[in-house]
Amino acid sequence: MIDCQYYQQNECRSCQWLEIPYDQQIAEKQHHLKQQLISLDCSDVHWLAPFKSNEQGFRNKAKMLVSGSVERPILGILKNPNDPQSAIDLCDCPLYPAHFSIIFSILKDFIGRAGLVPYNIAKQKGELKYILLTESIATGKLMLRFVLRTENKLPLIRRELPKLLEKLPHLEVISINLQPQHAAILEGEQEIFLTEQQFLPENFNGIPLFIRPQGFFQTNPKVAAGLYATAQQWVAEFPIYNLWDLFCGVGGFGLHCAKALQEKWGKPIKLTGIEISSSAILAASHSAKILGLEHVNFQSLNAASVMENKNENKPDLVIVNPPRRGIGKQLSEFLNQIQPHFILYSSCNAMTMGKDLQHLTCYKPLKIQLFDMFPQTSHYEVLVLLERKKIN
C-alpha cells in the first residue's frame, strides 16, 4: 500500500482503492470487465494479461486548485468546494513524480512575486484559480498554465517570468488561461501564450506526439505507451492499407498503426483521422509530417460526420477511442454497414463499450486486454480487436 499522509489523515480520498492490495485491484477490474461483456460470445477470444502500472509517481500532470493567500498559497483541493477554509495542500501527493514538489515550491514563490491573489470562491474575489503542470517523459520539459479570472496581472507575470525561467529552465510552454466565470469550470476558451512554443513534445515508442493546452492527453505515460504499442502490434499482423481513426485526439493510435503497417507491408498507408478539436488536429498533422507519412488526412470534424460521406473509400480498419459515453447505436450501425475488416475499440468505460459491442452485430472480438491507467481507483482502459464475422 502507498504511504499517503493525505489519505491516512482523511484529507483526500481521491484514491478510493488505496487500501486494496494492487494485485487484488487488478483482479477486481478484470472481473468487472468480463461482467460487462457477459452477453457477448467471447469463447474464441484471446484474453491477454492486464497491463500493470507503477503504483505511485505515475502521473505526468498535476491539476492544482489554488487557495490560501498570496503570501501563503495552497496548491491542492478544497474538501468542501464552497469553503476556502477547507483547503488541503497536495504538493507531496505520491501519484506525482517526487520532483514535482520542488517545482510547486518554486511556483508558490512566483505567485507571491507576481501578486497572483488566489481566487476566493466564497467572496468571488481574487485572480488565480488553478495551476496546471504537465511533464514530457521523453524530454523532461514542462508545460505550465495559470488559470486566471482576468488579464489584470499579465504585466506582473511577464515581469517576473525571466526569474521563473532561471529557476525552472525546463519550462517549454507557459500560458495564461482566462476563466472569468464564477463556476466549477476548470478552464476558459481563451489561451494567452507567454512562450514561443505552444506544444509540449512527447514521444511514445518512437512516435512523436504533441501535448497542447486545453487538449486531452493520457496522464499515465507508461501505460499509455503500452496501450499504443499493443494496438500497433495487433493491427500490424494484417494487410491493412486504409484506416480511419475516429476521436483521434493528437493521433496516438492512428500514427502508431500507420507507421507499423507501412514498415511491415512496404506499401503507403492511407490514414484518415477525425477529431473535433482543431488544435489536436494541428498536433496530429505535425506528427505525421515528422514521421514522413504522406497519405494522411486529419480533419477537425465531429466523429458522426463520417456517416455523411458516402463516397469515401471504405477502410480496412476503423479505430475508435470515444469519450465515456461510447460510440452509440447510430455509429455502431454505420460501421456494420460499411463493414471494415477490423475495428479496434479503445475504451475508458467498459459499461458503454459493452453496449456498443452488442450493437456491432457483424463483429466478433478477437483480442481483449485491460490497461491499468488509473491505479488506486476502480477506473481502467480496455483495448478490444474486433473482426468482421464470416458469412456462411
Swiss-Prot record:
Gene from which this protein is expressed: rlmC
Q: Which Pfam families does the record match to this protein?
A: tRNA_U5-meth_tr
| PROSITE patterns to which the protein is assigned, alphabetical | SAM_MT_RNA_M5U, TRMA_1, TRMA_2
Q: Known InterPro entries for this protein? A: 23SrRNA_MeTrfase_RlmC, MeTrfase_TrmA_AS, MeTrfase_TrmA_CS, SAM-dependent_MTases_sf, U5_MeTrfase_fam
Native source species: Haemophilus influenzae (strain PittEE)
List, alphabetically, the NCBIfam families matched. Answer: meth_trns_rumB (TIGR02085)
- Annotated keywords: 4Fe-4S, Iron, Iron-sulfur, Metal-binding, Methyltransferase, rRNA processing, S-adenosyl-L-methionine, Transferase
Summarizing the function annotation, the protein's role is: Catalyzes the formation of 5-methyl-uridine at position 747 (m5U747) in 23S rRNA.
Family, per the entry?
Belongs to the class I-like SAM-binding methyltransferase superfamily. RNA M5U methyltransferase family. RlmC subfamily.
Which positions does UniProt annotate for [4Fe-4S] cluster binding?
Answer: 4, 12, 15, 93
- The active site is formed by 348 (nucleophile)
Which BP terms from GO are recorded? rRNA base methylation
Task: Give the protein's recorded name.
Answer: 23S rRNA (uracil(747)-C(5))-methyltransferase RlmC
Q: Which residues are S-adenosyl-L-methionine-binding? A: 218, 247, 275, 321
Which EC number(s) does the record attach to this protein?
2.1.1.189
Reactions the enzyme catalyzes: uridine(747) in 23S rRNA + S-adenosyl-L-methionine = 5-methyluridine(747) in 23S rRNA + S-adenosyl-L-homocysteine + H(+)
